[in-house]
Amino acid sequence: DSSQYGSKCSLGEPSCFAVESESLLDYTPSDQAVFNEEAFKENVLKGLAFVAENDRFLSLGVKPTRPEPGYGYIQLGDAEGDNLYNVQSFTEKPERDFAKIFVDSGEFYWNTGIFISNVKHLRESFSRILPAVLRGFDESYRTFDVETENAYMKQNFPSYPNISVDYAILEKSDNVSVLKCDFGWLTSAPGTVSMRQCKERG
C-alpha cells in the first residue's frame, strides 16, 4: 500500500546520504496531523539542537490520552535532560488491555513515528544494521539531480526491505532518546481512530 511504499522509499532515499555528514534530518511521516504548529516547531528545533551534539536518534513522543491499541508506544527510561529520556522499550500496537496498563503507568508515550538524527549517525546505523540499503550508493556523490536519483532508485528499490525506519533502525538501536512533546497529534495510519471519530467523541 501507499504507506509501505513511502516507508520503503525513504529507507533508500539517496539524497539523505548525499548531503554533508554534519547535516540534520527530521523524518516526519505523511500521515500525521499536528494541531499546535508553534509547539511542534519548538520541539523540532530542540530536537535538532540535541542531535547536532549527540550521535543518537531522537523520537518525538506524545502523552497518550486514551488506551489506543492502534498506536505504537515508547517506554521512558532514565532522564537525560529537560523532557528528554532514554528509550527503555518500543511496543507496537499492543492489545487494548496492555495499552490501558501502559497509559495508567505513566511510563509510556505514544510513538509518533517522527524522529530526528544527524546524517552521519543515520548512515552509520544503516551501514551496521541494514547494509543492503546502501548497496550501490557511491559515496563520491554529493549532489543528486532528479535523473541520477531516479536511476539509483530504479536499480536499488526492489532489494529494499518493505519496512519503516522505526522498525528497521530505531527499534534495533541502543542509543535512542525520546522527547516528551505536547503539540496535539493524531495519525491516520490504518487501525487507528480517525480524526473524524475523535471529533465525534469530543
Predicted regions and their residues:
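Conserved beta-loop-beta/alpha segment of the NTase-like Rossmann-fold superfamily
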Residues: 1-79, 123-129
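Catalytic core of tubulin tyrosine ligase-like
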Residues: 71-202
